[in-house]
């Protein structure tokens, strides 16, 4: 139904554009500035056209869409945000893994290495690594050597399980298992320097405890315990 689609360049699977109608105008925003994107969206919207700003994954995670929404609000233009599947969720599916395993990690830290875009104080990799929680690291696959150093400096052991997920959910998706200490080696061996997520933590191992939710000794709002806790051990 869209009359105009502005999509986020190499980050969006081009196969999605095949669903556009024949007369739809399609623009690649990879070489565009924020102002150029807005200059394309506003006239089309004011003319009653259906405009789609197509981001990768879910726009709420490193999508740079707040600045676009603020401008549209100032111009009095209505819009809808359609939730997507973030690549960190797609990466878990590719890994066939669960980020929040009982007695392993009940928290997921989504972050990135500092590059040309700085990160605030106390939000650097080493600071977060000190928690020992599951970490999903965006926009950092070209800095795996430094990433490994910061993870270890923060408290992860070099042999902590890690995985690099390249182009999660794409047809050419690739999963590389490694450790915190071998991240750089694994990335180089597989020619991965962009379009990849890095996951770190014990959730990639084999040790965890059974959840209480489906434990027959556990009572919750929808079910009474059916056996004594001692008998379930």
PLM features: residue spans?
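Structural recognition of alpha->loop->beta junctions
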Residues: 3, 72-78, 102, 183-192
